[in-house]
């Protein structure tokens, strides 16, 4: 993956942007991360590393392609078991205000966030092909954010909305396979 798309790990646990922030991390010697929470949603797209995720008092093993969504105010942290392999992941923060804005456009944008808060099921495994599609959307968004291209400010929200709708559809169709098949 391109080095210029990576971000050095930041211990800051608050958003600087009003709507969202997206990071690609590739850490080799990450120090311990304390249990913390945010006032925004945190999507976590795991790629590599000997890591588990603690959410509340539960500890979950994670694997390549796992997606995690932590709602606002839920304590969580990664637990690094070994630094023998790099700890690679994308982290996508999105504000509650932006989610509410999308909800006004369509309730379909909020399905996943509502599902996670009600079910307390924070993890969604994916297969390699699905995760590659998600990774492509994440990289495209990072590249656009870091670019100075014509139309950048118009393109960025389209990419964010596309990513969110894709994730919502993915989870909805997994949880409602009969309905998805009848709609085809």
What are these model-derived regions, one by one?
Residues 86-88, 157-161:
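Σ70-family region 2.3-2.4 aromatic/basic alpha-helix that recognizes the −10 promoter
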Residues 48, 72, 94-96:
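Residues immediately flanking
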Residues 1-66, 74, 107-109, 118-122:
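Generic protein-terminus/edge-of-domain signal
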Residues 2-21, 79-143, 169-174:
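A hydrophobic/aromatic-rich effector-binding and dimerization subdomain
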Residues 52-54, 70, 76-84:
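Short beta-strand His + acidic residue motifs that chelate non-heme Fe in jelly-roll/DSBH
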Residues 42-45, 133-137, 159, 163-166:
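Amphipathic, well-ordered alpha-helical segments in soluble domains
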Residues 120-128, 145-158, 165-184:
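Short, Lys/Arg-enriched, Trp-marked, Pro/Gly-tolerant hinge/linker segments that flank
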């Amino acid at each position: 993956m391109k080095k210029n798309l990576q971000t050095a790990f930041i211990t800051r646990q608050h958003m600087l942007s009003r709507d969202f922030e997206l990071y690609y991390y590739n850490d080799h010697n990450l120090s311990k991360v304390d249990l913390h929470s945010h006032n925004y949603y945190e999507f976590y797209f795991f790629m590599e590393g000997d890591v588990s995720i603690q959410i509340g008092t539960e500890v979950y093993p994670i694997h390549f392609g796992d997606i995690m969504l932590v709602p606002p105010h839920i304590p969580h942290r990664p637990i690094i078991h070994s630094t023998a392999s790099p700890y690679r992941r994308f982290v996508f923060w999105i504000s509650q205000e932006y989610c509410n804005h999308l909800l006004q456009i369509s309730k379909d944008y909020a399905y996943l966030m509502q599902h996670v808060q009600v079910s307390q099921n924070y993890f969604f495994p994916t297969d390699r092909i699905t995760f590659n599609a998600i990774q492509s959307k994440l990289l495209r968004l990072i590249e656009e954010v870091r670019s100075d291209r014509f139309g950048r400010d118009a393109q960025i929200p389209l990419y964010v909305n596309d990513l969110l709708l894709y994730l919502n559809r993915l989870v909805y169709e997994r949880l409602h396979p009969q309905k998805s098949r009848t709609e085809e």
